[in-house]
């Protein structure tokens, strides 16, 4: 995305005029300006400079009396589902942006772009071309908190590789049918082993030159020796004391590269008489940190004891919407820090793979579920590859309502700390309203059972995808607002009601089904004994666990109930069509 389109040019604008403009603005360019009547094209050295040119010039600079427009140059065949939205208010809440984007269709992905400007920039992928076109028509120039949004297409490489579909197929949110083409980005992503989670490090800025080496010789040697791809993000956070490094390789390759980098920094510190301790700093997405720490900090303590290191983790308060990573600081010798890195990353990779498995299973249980748009999983900008979520299998689709029918609504009672009610509701009820719109669910908070009640019940009503979105955001909000400590994982209790005649099927013979359910989902599932069915002949099933565990358990129980309903329907059909002989 380093090729630029320059529009709204006067008839007399020459390549020299544009060269002077770019030089005056200190924006480098490569090659010649290709000038046409009213517009021109030029290449920047990289995507970062292209973004700076857009921010500095578009709608801000006049040439021969006309205000010029600068955008990414996008071939017509690649103007499909991907948009870039600029000039977003810097303190805008994520839920507000979410709900605004969702008005025009299914948002498959939304990632922030690093820029030097005060305002935010995001790249958005919509579910289809029409949704993106509608969004660009409605949002370009849209006033949001006194900021005028700027929206333009960015290249959609997938659109260029796929032939146009003659007939629309499937429901909104479904991807292409059949496997992706060989060589396509999605094919590559699907084949990528899930263990290939990159290692993200923070290194002092003064050592970056030594790590790169003269004309890049040192970094090339490391990549060759470890069979890895190493990105040093020098341009991020200009003037910062530390720079992130992303290492893509096998777990062994990442660890070897990490150790070599630590050795280079130590040697450079000795040569420059730098006396301060240089700890190993690892960046990890907040989603994984709770499991790394473990219950009461046991996992972290064990790593410290086994590796003879001191490990600290940055506080939750340091997190922002666009920076969901925590800094894990490891102090010790190079050898002990290297051992600690292996153990820390092993735990993070396990958590990542478990979440991938849970999310993929969710996609099979809820066909068309758009996981990337939920904001519940690390974006690729954090250095962790996004999960490859395929469309549902035929077997899963068979249990889903036929096209044209709405999925059945469910009611879940989720119990949250009583002190968290204000955060969930928000000022004048704004947060709960935004959450309800975003998820497409009815969300109500039941009155407290008493003045000293420690828990409050949130009643969520909506189809499976709405449940997933609403509950996921509630879990996230509780963690974000520090209602659970930095060493705690958010675990909540959810209640769902099932017909009393189906409770036995949930439990299974000798408790077999409920035990299998707990093993599969890692959630605690309890069907209290001796329950008196309510006026609708229903009993409560209690589910306790972290978000993915709780969701999987809910889906599996709903699957059991759907199976029971189908069997009942079949029996009714048989009885009405072919009367069964009575037993004597």
UniProtKB/Swiss-Prot annotation:
The keyword Disulfide bond does not apply. Residues 184-194 have a biased composition (Polar residues). PROSITE patterns: KH_TYPE_1, RRM. Residues 160-199 are annotated as: Disordered. It comes from the Eukaryota. Homodimer and multimer. This is Insulin-like growth factor 2 mRNA-binding protein 3. It comes from Gallus gallus (Chicken). The lineage of its organism: Eukaryota, Metazoa, Chordata, Craniata, Vertebrata.
């Amino acid at each position: 995305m380093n090729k630029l389109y320059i529009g709204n040019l006067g008839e007399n604008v020459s390549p020299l005029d544009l060269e002077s403009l770019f030089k005056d603005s200190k924006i480098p360019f490569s090659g010649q300006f290709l000038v046409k009547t009213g517009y021109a094209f030029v290449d920047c050295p990289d995507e970062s400079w292209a973004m700076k040119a857009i921010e500095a010039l578009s709608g801000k600079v006049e040439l021969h009396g006309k205000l010029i427009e600068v955008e990414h140059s996008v071939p017509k065949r690649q103007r499909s589902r991907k948009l870039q939205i600029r000039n977003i208010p810097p303190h805008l809440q994520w839920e507000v942006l979410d709900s605004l984007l969702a008005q025009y269709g299914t948002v498959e992905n939304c990632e922030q772009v690093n820029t030097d400007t005060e305002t935010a920039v995001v790249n958005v992928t919509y579910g289809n071309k029409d949704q993106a076109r509608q969004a660009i028509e409605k949002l370009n120039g849209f006033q949001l908190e006194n900021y005028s949004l700027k929206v333009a297409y960015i290249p959609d490489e997938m659109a260029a590789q796929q032939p146009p579909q003659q007939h629309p197929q499937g429901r909104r949110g479904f991807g292409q049918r059949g496997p992706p083409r060989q060589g396509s980005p999605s094919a590559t992503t699907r084949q990528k082993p899930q263990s290939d989670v990159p290692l993200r490090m923070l290194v002092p800025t003064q050592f970056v030159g030594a790590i790169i080496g003269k004309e890049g010789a040192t970094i090339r040697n490391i990549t060759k020796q470890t069979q890895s791809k190493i990105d040093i993000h020098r341009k991020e956070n200009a003037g910062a004391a530390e720079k992130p490094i992303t290492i893509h390789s096998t777990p062994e390759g990442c660890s070897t590269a990490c150790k070599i980098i630590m050795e280079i920094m130590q040697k450079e510190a000795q040569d420059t008489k730098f006396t301060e301790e240089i700890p190993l700093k690892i960046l990890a997405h907040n989603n994984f940190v709770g499991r790394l720490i473990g219950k009461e900090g046991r996992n972290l303590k064990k790593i410290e004891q086994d590796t003879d290191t001191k490990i600290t983790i940055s506080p939750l308060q340091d997190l922002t919407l666009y920076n969901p990573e925590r800094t894990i600081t490891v102090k010790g010798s190079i050898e002990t820090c290297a051992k600690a890195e292996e153990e820390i990353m092993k735990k993070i990779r396990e958590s990542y793979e478990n979440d991938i498995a849970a999310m993929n299973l969710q996609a099979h249980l809820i066909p068309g579920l758009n996981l990337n748009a939920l904001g519940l999983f690390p974006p690729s900008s954090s250095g962790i590859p996004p999960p490859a979520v395929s469309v549902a299998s035929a077997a899963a689709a068979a249990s889903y309502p036929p096209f044209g029918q709405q999925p059945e609504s469910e009611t879940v009672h989720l119990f949250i700390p009583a002190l968290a009610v204000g955060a969930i509701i928000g000022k004048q009820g704004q947060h709960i309203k935004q959450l309800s719109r975003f998820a497409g669910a009815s969300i109500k908070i039941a009155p407290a059972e008493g003045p000293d009640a420690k828990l409050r019940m949130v009643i969520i009503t909506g189809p499976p995808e709405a449940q997933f979105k609403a509950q996921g955001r509630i879990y996230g909000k509780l963690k974000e607002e520090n209602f659970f400590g930095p060493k705690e994982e958010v675990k909540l209790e959810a209640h769902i009601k099932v017909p009393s005649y189906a409770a036995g099927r949930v439990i299974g013979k000798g408790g077999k089904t409920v035990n299998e359910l707990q093993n599969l989902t890692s959630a605690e599932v309890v069907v209290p004994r001796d329950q008196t069915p309510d006026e609708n002949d229903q009993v409560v099933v209690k589910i306790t666990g972290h978000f993915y565990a709780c969701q999987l358990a809910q889906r599996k129980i709903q699957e059991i109930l759907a199976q029971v309903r189908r069997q009942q329907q079949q029996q009714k059909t048989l009885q009405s069509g072919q009367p069964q002989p009575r037993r004597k």
